[in-house]
Amino acid sequence: MAVSTHISHATLPRRRGRVASGACGAASTIALQAIALAATLVATAACAEIIKKEDMLRGITTTRDRCAATAWTLWLNVDGEDFCVRYYLSTAGGEGTRPVIFLTGDHLGTVNTKTWQWIPIGEDRNANVTFDPAATYRDINTDDLIKTADAFSKMAKTTAIYLARIGIGGSSGNHLFRSTLLELHLMNAALDAIKQRHGFEGFHLAGQSGGSTIVTGLAAGRSDIACAVSGSGRLMRSYYSSSTDSARTRVNPLEFIPSIAHNQSVRFIMVTDSADRSVPAKEQTPFAERMHQAGRDIPQYFVTATDDYHHNVVGYTELVTGGCVLRKSDADIATAVGNMVKGNAAYSEQRRKEIALLAQNGIASRQPSSDSRPAPEGRTRTRGGGT
């Protein structure tokens, strides 16, 4: 993996020189001051943008100069390709030198990995079966990304960063190559660059769906990760490829099990809805079982998502990540998750009643969501808990 980095930001102050040994306190203070200033700058300099789905479907291209003129960007050369990676930093809930990094799920439908083209929505057999086309084929408002970073920051009471994945959220590249070794290498290089820019000590990681696949690879390959939370992550599908092209080689989470199992510095946690239609539990739970066989027990929290596909567990992932960052026990996190499950079940039941009333009055005909079923009380599979 070849990586070169040019860190560009129109306004963010850069730290100069090295801090001498023994000056860790001063270094941390400087880093926190830089974070606070950076968070102020993002509120004033980074206006909301709408990233069009048509552009993302084609693949996002940019120049080094345009990247440098855009707030919160990194110009990286990874595996022989230039990328402009964008991120959104928040200190809404607090500041720290080990931020939470969030990686979102996949967008834009299904990829034909034989041709490496998008499957047209009319021909995509997964549409309306494993995903809602209206939810994935849509523009992205960068305000929403900042709000997500805010939510993680408030829950974990520290700095949080929404790191835009390849080809979406403001990062350049083609999202066709999501969950590949190229994307893993790109996100890893972005963490190195962010760490250098802000003087961070390390990171906590959180992912949703496809983002969790990348989280797993980062947790296995880095020594500076404390918490790693997989939300609805497809962690059991084994990919074989004879390609030597990192852009066409899918990440294989199973290969990471030995590294994670033996890395006692990382606390790995899973969040799963047993009724998930997008990434079934059978493609999540065996990862925890394989980890157990490798000598490492990890918590897996079973939850009830409120969307029709039982797949979006970001709210739960925020809660679990916050608990991990704040060093709560597995039991304490399980209690908090159980309370959230009950609250979401009450919300779903109320929504079902409102929809039924509207339908009865002839105002709406939408059927109640399947997530009004009884909640599973946030049950966990821990086999001894996390580390």
Residue ranges and their predicted role:
Residues 198-209:
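Alpha/beta-hydrolase fold nucleophile elbow
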Residues 230-239:
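Active-site nucleophile loop of the alpha/beta-hydrolase fold
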Residues 80-156:
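Short, surface-exposed "cap/lid" segments of acyl-processing enzymes
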Residues 174-197:
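Alpha/beta-hydrolase active-site loop
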Residues 131-134, 160-181:
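Cap/lid segment of the alpha/beta-hydrolase catalytic domain
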Residues 294-387:
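C-terminal catalytic histidine-bearing segment of alpha/beta-hydrolase fold enzymes
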Residues 239-304:
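The feature captures the conserved acid-bearing segment of alpha/beta-hydrolase catalytic domains
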Residues 207-217:
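Glycine-rich nucleophile elbow surrounding the catalytic serine of serine-hydrolase chemistry
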